[in-house]
């Protein structure tokens, strides 16, 4: 659970911004989206491999540039 304490003289906007950052860093939304529907393990592994391949290609292109 993500929680944020309000500091003295802190505006609601700043408090909300801090909460959103903590929420995003905690990975709550990412985990929720991941569990929204079932993905077969074989498909999940295939997607992970393709993501890895793309990431490696981008890194390789950046090194060559």
Swiss-Prot record:
Family annotation (Gene3D superfamilies): Ribosomal protein S8
Origin superkingdom: Bacteria
Molecular-function GO terms, alphabetical: structural constituent of ribosome
Cross-referenced InterPro entries: Ribosomal_bS21 (IPR001911), Ribosomal_bS21_sf (IPR038380)
Gene Ontology BP annotations: translation
GO cellular component, one term: ribosome
Key words, A-Z: Ribonucleoprotein, Ribosomal protein
Keyword Nucleotide-binding: no
Record-stated family: Belongs to the bacterial ribosomal protein bS21 family.
NCBIfam families xrefs: S21p
Protein name: Small ribosomal subunit protein bS21
Organism of derivation: Chlorobaculum parvum (strain DSM 263 / NCIMB 8327)
């Amino acid at each position: 659970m993500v929680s944020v304490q309000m500091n003295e003289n802190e505006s609601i906007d700043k408090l909300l911004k801090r909460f959103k950052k903590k929420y995003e860093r905690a990975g709550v939304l990412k985990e929720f989206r991941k569990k929204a529907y079932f993905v077969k393990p074989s498909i999940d592994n295939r997607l992970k491999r393709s993501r890895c391949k793309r990431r490696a290609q981008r890194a390789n292109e950046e090194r060559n540039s």
